[in-house]
């Protein structure tokens, strides 16, 4: 059998890319040494494009990243590379994310969310210490503590509003309450939603900021208006209006605006795709698509396992990818079409324990991160965060774990490998969990 180390042997390849025009080379077949690897191909692309400074490229053959020589890859794929023209896709390589300073908490971090206000990134966290928190990650400083829940807080999300200076947040937790925190220059208030009969596992804010959805262990999805009731605020009895602290000086109790019935078990996570379309996952092994305006279930895709996390990426008007983090340790990608149904399911095998959360890269439509538990004895082999390129399912792009220096003293070492929440901003991937910290992994834009 031929070896990639043999000299003189050549293969014919055809290069193509989905990158911008400035990175496009001819797709005409060319002959290259069979022992060429990623670095050699990258040098070839840089030479053809005359790039200065040069850029690192990555390469895919039939949806698998090239991690050996061209010939070895062809032989492993059981293809007759000597006779065929090999189609090679190239893309800009993603540098390994670099760990940054962490943000400490008093207890486990159960939820994470991110947003940008006037060009400044914000993080929101939900913690088992009964509090939510707002952070400026560039300074790793806690800007605000959201006090009011009486039990662990599990879900958190930012609310987009017309008030460009405001940072509004929704939280939910084991006290069965939903809290909407609104901060204005003239006044601040907390809207407290009551009605769930079980732990509120997750909250998700509508893109317009008018509605917050909450999912619970009572199998229900409730919808809450983010608009205060003027009549109640003007004439509410004492139990509906009370001081909470010097920042959020008004509380208003609210009943649900509506319900979405049809979940067969606990609702673990939700994500909005548009102002009227919501996706949910939970203990009933299904990804559910909801028509919020009509108040009904629109579509159900049966999954392989219980879903712990869900995220959506809107590629275009007719192409939506839904990613789930599942109890069997895998992330799954569902290709939803507006015409109905799904087109295939991609499985990304990630962990020996359960996967807990999933997030898309906001600057690269192909990349998705998933976090979870590694149920293995040798912790040196454990990487609780993985970054995948959804074009390649054999192995992740990057395996990440918390640096030893970022694990607090007194924390069980295994806890630093149990990540429960993720969020991805243009500058960094953030993860939190049993280590009682939010860990930052700074990413570099390659466009």
From Swiss-Prot:
Which residues does the annotated region (Ubiquitin-like (UBL) domain) include? Answer: 11-92
- One GO MF term: ribonucleoprotein complex binding
Q: Does the keyword Methyltransferase apply?
A: no
Ranges for the WD repeats = 107-147, 148-191, 195-234, 262-300, 304-344, 350-398, 414-447
Known PROSITE patterns for this protein? WD_REPEATS_2, WD_REPEATS_REGION
Short name of any one Pfam family annotated for the protein: WD40
* Main subcellular location of this protein, as a coarse class: nucleus
Q: Which HAMAP family match?
A: WDR12
Q: What does this protein do?
A: Required for maturation of ribosomal RNAs and formation of the large ribosomal subunit.
**What is the protein named?**
Ribosome biogenesis protein WDR12 homolog
Protein source organism:
Monosiga brevicollis (Choanoflagellate)
């Amino acid at each position: 059998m031929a070896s990639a180390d043999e000299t003189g042997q050549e293969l014919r390849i055809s290069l193509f890319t989905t990158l911008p025009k400035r990175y496009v080379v001819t797709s005409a077949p060319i002959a290259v040494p069979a022992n060429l690897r990623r670095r050699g191909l990258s040098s070839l692309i840089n030479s053809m494009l005359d790039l200065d400074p040069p850029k690192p490229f990555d390469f895919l053959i039939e949806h698998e990243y090239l991690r050996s020589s061209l010939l070895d890859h062809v032989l492993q794929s059981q293809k007759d590379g000597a006779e065929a023209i090999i189609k090679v896709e190239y893309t800009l390589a993603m540098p390994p994310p670099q760990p940054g300073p962490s943000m400490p908490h008093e207890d486990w971090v159960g939820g994470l969310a991110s947003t940008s206000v006037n060009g400044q990134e914000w993080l929101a966290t939900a913690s088992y210490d009964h509090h939510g928190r707002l952070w400026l990650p560039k300074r790793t400083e806690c800007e605000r503590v959201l006090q009011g829940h009486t039990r662990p807080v599990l879900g958190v999300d930012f609310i987009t509003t017309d008030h460009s200076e405001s940072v509004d947040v929704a939280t939910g937790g084991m006290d069965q309450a939903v809290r909407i925190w609104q901060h204005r220059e003239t006044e601040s208030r907390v809207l407290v939603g009551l009605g769930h009969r079980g732990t509120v596992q997750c909250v998700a804010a509508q893109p317009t900021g008018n509605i917050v959805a909450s999912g619970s262990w009572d199998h229900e999805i409730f919808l809450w208006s983010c608009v205060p009731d003027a009549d109640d605020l003007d004439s509410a009895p004492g139990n509906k209006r009370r001081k909470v602290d010097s920042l959020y000086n008004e509380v208003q109790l609210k009943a649900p605006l509506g319900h979405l019935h049809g979940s067969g078990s606990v609702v673990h996570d939700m994500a909005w795709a548009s102002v009227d379309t919501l996706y949910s996952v939970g203990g009933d092994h299904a990804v559910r698509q909801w028509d919020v305006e009509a108040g009904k279930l629109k579509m159900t895709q049966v999954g392989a396992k219980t879903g712990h996390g869900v995220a959506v990426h809107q590629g275009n008007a007719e192409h939506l990818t839904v990613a789930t983090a599942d109890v069997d340790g895998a992330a799954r990608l569902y290709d939803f079409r507006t015409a109905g149904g799904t087109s295939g399911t991609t499985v990304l095998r990630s962990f020996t324990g359960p996967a807990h959360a999933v997030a898309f890269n906001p600057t690269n439509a192909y990349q998705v991160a998933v976090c979870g538990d590694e149920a293995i004895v040798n912790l040196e082999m454990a990487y609780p965060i993985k970054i995948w390129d959804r074009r390649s399912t054999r192995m992740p792009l990057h395996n990440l774990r918390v640096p030893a220096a970022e694990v607090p003293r007194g924390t069980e070492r295994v806890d630093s490998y149990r990540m429960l929440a993720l969020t991805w901003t243009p500058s960094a991937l953030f993860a939190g969990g049993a280590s009682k910290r939010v860990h930052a992994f700074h990413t570099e834009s390659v466009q």
